[in-house]
């Protein structure tokens, strides 16, 4: 079982130009207010004041105020998850189990601040927040695959992340209503979703090996070969 304790040892930083900024303190302070006030401007101003962050600096760090602070909280938890995944030295695990464990790690981290995450998901569910909601889910999926050293360079880069995004988004919604001990029901839910994905992959493989599938892929593979994974901009 994965155990994650609240600790001051973790430091979440972002880079603005050439300046590395520590956001852990303001996120920690905000989490004291969010359960009562939510991710709003009141929480944002209280957190900035208590962290001694000026109004000018706060607008530089969080242009959209409470929204960007909320997203920084989620990104911080993603980074914690990434570090835990990389610490796991069990290289004998199948990829199925590695992905399952990664999702569970992320949920356990979220469970440390469940009310804050609940309010974040509620805010992200509003229609005008759809782009941020989609980006949040995608970024978590991407963080998991990157932490697992995914080396895909073609269309599989996208399909892996899209599939995992579906599993993660459905899991986190299920977790919000889970009151079981040690998140047992959520863990079972994750395994069921992964089983469904594996069953689909099995069907897809059978189709590829069939006569119809081979004929279809003759043309489709030409298109798929043009799709490449994004590359980092080395000119920055």
Where are these regions (language model features)?
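Short hydrophobic alpha-helical segments enriched in small aliphatic residues
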Residues: 9-11
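Short, amphipathic alpha-helix enriched in basic
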Residues: 21-56, 64-71, 75
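Conserved phosphoryl-transfer catalytic core
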Residues: 76-86
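Hydrophobic alpha-helical connector segments
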Residues: 85-119
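C-terminal ligand-sensing/allosteric alpha-helical core of TetR-family HTH transcriptional regulators
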Residues: 95-109, 136, 140-147, 193
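Amphipathic alpha-helical packing segments from all-alpha helical-bundle domains
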Residues: 128-150, 160-165, 169
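Hydrophobic/aromatic-rich alpha-helical bundle segments in the mid-to-C-terminal region
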Residues: 150-166, 170-194, 200-211
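Long, charge-rich low-complexity segments
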Residues: 203-236
